[in-house]
């Protein structure tokens, strides 16, 4: 299964609580931090919800 490299590009300051929780659940705390996750439906859904805050690369 493919892996996704997810980077937080924009701050969560001033964002709704559900977006903050989603970013935190992805494992991101600080801007420009990068995490790697397996590519599955749950992760894709979270990325879709905060797509304006993150950038995604396939590995």
Curated annotation (Swiss-Prot):
PROSITE patterns: RIBOSOMAL_L30. It comes from the Bacteria. Disulfide bonds: none annotated. One of its GO terms (biological process) is translation. Pfam families: Ribosomal_L30. Part of the 50S ribosomal subunit. Belongs to the universal ribosomal protein uL30 family. NCBIfam families: rpmD_bact. HAMAP family: Ribosomal_uL30_B (MF_01371_B). This is Large ribosomal subunit protein uL30. It comes from Bacillus subtilis (strain 168). The gene is rpmD.
